UniProtKB/Swiss-Prot annotation:
Cu cation A binds at residues 38, 56, 66. Cu cation B binds at residues 193, 197, 219. It comes from the Bacteria. GO terms for molecular function: metal ion binding; tyrosinase activity. Binds 2 copper ions per subunit. This is a copper-containing oxidase that functions in the formation of pigments such as melanins and other polyphenolic compounds. InterPro entries: Di-copper_centre_dom_sf, Tyrosinase/Hemocyanin, Tyrosinase_Cu-bd. Gene3D superfamilies: Di-copper center containing domain from catechol oxidase. Its cofactor is Cu(2+). It is an enzyme of class 1 (oxidoreductase). It comes from Streptomyces galbus. Keywords: Copper, Melanin biosynthesis, Metal-binding, Monooxygenase, Oxidoreductase. The lineage of its organism: Bacteria, Bacillati, Actinomycetota, Actinomycetes, Kitasatosporales. This is Tyrosinase. Its EC number is 1.14.18.1.
Amino acid sequence: MTVRKNQAALTADEKRRFVAAVLELKRNGRYDEFVRTHNEFIMSDTRTGRRGGPGHRLPLPFLPWHRRFLLDFEQALQSVDSSVALPYWDWSTDRTVRASLWAPDFLGGTGRSSDGRVMDGPFAASTGNWPVNVRVDGRTFLRRSLGTGVRELPTRAEVDSVLSMATYDMAPYNSASDGFRNHLEGWRGVNLHNRVHVWVGGQMATGVSPNDPVFWLHHAYNRQLWAEWQRRHPGAGYVPTGGTPDVVDLNDTMKPWNDVRPADLLTHTAHYTFDV
């Protein structure tokens, strides 16, 4: 069984193996396929805040969709090195630019002030190993501006305030909704998930956010929070369950796979566990 660990607890060898597997996926072209898929199916409508993609019903089921997306990526990593698991970044604890994940032996740090170019670590442009091929502009290098777009990452108190919400979601099931899903996604309230994307900056603040490997650690933590919410609220079911216009319901299939439903992805226990 795969165990997803807090990145702060990774050994030097676990970091090295994770980075090596990510770089191999980049080298063989599979990594950019994930970036392309995300850019196609997770796009923000600046007028409504809803997310979706060409030919996809809106809004897309944020938590189940990303659970499958991360499972596919984790399996791709394990096809390179079976010992690798996706680590998660608890940004409510590791909240500064000095956190261990930004070290040169792991993800590298923030970008330079002139253009955001990441200058250290294995994904810096100077290594020649990380060209940004799926992009929203002409810049071909990884960019970050840690703590510039928004000053503070979410606190544990803010996380707990969202975990305390007893309802998973409610109509109209979009960026205007109340409930756990929308507050975790970050369209309302303390803006958890979305705020982290903006805090990192660079490609993380765009539809091609998987260009930054921290994307996977961020979303792995979102899945951990979903699992924690489910433990706190065992009687709260997933909604919407059916017959909802312009929404992917519980038993609807999700693109791009077309063979998996939110109902198939409500629990992680068949696929992995967490170290907490």
